[in-house]
């Protein structure tokens, strides 16, 4: 959908009823003792079609990586083994799937909306220490409500700006060394371009 947006002549969005966003994403993990530092290492791609003036359906793909450094400490790996090391933790999340959007004033140049995204999420939980890496991969179910606004500086609405706030929850689980995760909660914001 993104490549099509650049190849088409400038007119009211991708088509009279289509939309697309390309966003930088800032993600803040919640209730996470593995890698809970806020991070701007993320993107969001979304495209869809308005089946009525207000209701749209589409597809999305997003990703984010959160990192956290842990100073040297001793980890009891088992009853007979321990390890003293510092660690760099990394939590990568890749949700994708269907999006549903309700826009409030479609005829305006400033269009607020509510959205819901649903689909699978791939996650990778990694701990880097010295020259080694321990990791766990998992798939889960993802749900994310979002509130945002699309702003077009010109009447033709060919290119605009997109701002959104979101919350997300995924059922992913993981275990690395002595750390475990059971569900991933996040909130954040997205800034980007709208087509």
Language-model regions: role of each:
Residues 1-7:
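Bacterial N-terminal signal peptides
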Residues 11-57, 192-194:
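Short glycine/proline- and aromatic-enriched beta-strand/turn motifs that initiate or cap beta-hairpins
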Residues 17, 46-129, 140-143, 151-157:
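Gram-negative (and chloroplast) outer-membrane scaffold detector with strong preference
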Residues 22, 43-45, 96-100, 114, ...:
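Membrane-embedded beta-strands of outer-membrane beta-barrel proteins
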Residues 23-29, 62-64, 117-121, 164-170, ...:
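Outer-membrane beta-barrel pore domains and translocons
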Residues 66-72, 84, 143, 148-195:
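Predominantly the C-terminal beta-signal and adjacent terminal strand-loop region
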């Amino acid at each position: 959908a993104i490549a099509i947006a650049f190849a088409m002549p400038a007119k009211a969005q991708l088509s009279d009823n289509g939309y697309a966003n390309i966003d930088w994403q800032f993600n803040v993990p919640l209730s996470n003792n593995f890698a809970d530092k806020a991070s701007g290492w993320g993107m969001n791609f979304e495209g869809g079609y308005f089946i009525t003036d207000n209701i749209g359906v589409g597809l999305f793909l997003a990703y984010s990586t959160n990192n956290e450094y842990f100073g040297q400490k001793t980890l009891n790996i088992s009853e007979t083994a321990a390890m003293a090391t510092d660690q760099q933790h990394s939590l990568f999340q890749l949700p994708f799937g269907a999006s549903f959007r309700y826009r409030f004033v479609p005829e305006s140049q400033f269009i607020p909306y509510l959205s819901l995204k649903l689909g699978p999420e791939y996650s990778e939980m990694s701990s880097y220490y010295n020259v080694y890496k321990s990791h766990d991969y998992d798939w889960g179910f993802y749900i994310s409500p979002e509130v945002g606004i699309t702003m077009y500086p010109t009447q033709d609405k060919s290119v605009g700006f997109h701002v959104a706030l979101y919350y997300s929850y995924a059922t992913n689980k993981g275990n690395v060394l002595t750390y475990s995760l059971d569900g991933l909660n996040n909130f954040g914001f997205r800034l980007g371009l709208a087509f």
